[in-house]
Amino acid sequence: FMPTIRGSDVGSKKRYAGLSVDAAGNESMIYRGLEMARSDWTPLARQFQEGLLSRVFQGAPYREFIIEYAHSTLAGKKDDLLIYRKRLRHRLDAYVANVPPQVRAARIADEYNDRVGRPRQYQNGGWIQYVMTRNGPEPLESRRSRIDYEHYLAKQIKPIADSILIPLGEDFVTLTSSQQELF
């Protein structure tokens, strides 16, 4: 399976998934360049992609899986999978014009560390874990806002689903729109 490049109808030779069968008949999935293999996607996205591709390759029902996955995400049943883990490659003060979400989360974390009398952790780079909330990115250690589940559906689940569903003649919105309680 070679999903199309987003915004195009052409596949990418560096992004694919396949079902490999060895001489003994043992099956294993192979992922290259997809969200499963990338470190900048959440565990939610990786688990969803693996589950969806596995069902498609096995000829198992996948529509119910997509609907249930979206529903359980919105219901807060997958909160432990919503964590972004990103590396800060520069000092925090080096981010001026373009401030990505992980930098915003790191600044909030260090402000929190200042308030509680702990040393700052992120001024010189490092790894940050954060979630997307209704007030933007917030670090795990000081999250106060409600999780933005719609962000995870729109930015993590939908792109993966559409990259697999569109070649099959379906799409995420159509599949889930019959489930009024989702949106």
Language-model features: locations:
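DNA-dependent DNA polymerase catalytic subunits
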Residues: 1-183
